[in-house]
Amino acid sequence: MKASVKVNGDRLRRIRTEQALTLRALGERSGVAFDTINKLENGHRPARLSTIRKLADALSVEPKELMKGEE
């Protein structure tokens, strides 16, 4: 079983838009499907740790910045 965690969707969206990235652009940069990113931003699904790592790398942030409960 792969570990999954809650993503702070609002924070993910804010960081993405601050970097002027569309869902598709972040998807291309990270290798994560844009519809998956959309679901994460809207709180419709948890993410695997590997997905959070890919998104964090693409956004040049620490993975913990994208997780729920981290301020």
Kindly give the residue locations of the regions a language model identified.
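A short, Lys/Arg-rich alpha-helix, primarily the initiator
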Residues: M1-E18
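Short alpha-helical DNA-recognition segment
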Residues: A20-K39
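Short amphipathic recognition helices of helix-turn-helix/homeodomain-type DNA-binding modules
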Residues: E65-E71
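The alpha-helix within a helix-turn-helix
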Residues: R16, G27, A56
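Residue-level detection of the helix-turn-helix DNA-binding "recognition helix"
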Residues: T17, G31, N42-H44, R53, ...
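DNA major-groove recognition helix of helix-turn-helix/homeodomain DNA-binding modules
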Residues: S50-E65
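Helix-turn-helix DNA-binding elements, focusing on the entry/boundary residues of the two helices
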Residues: L12, L23, F34, L49-I52
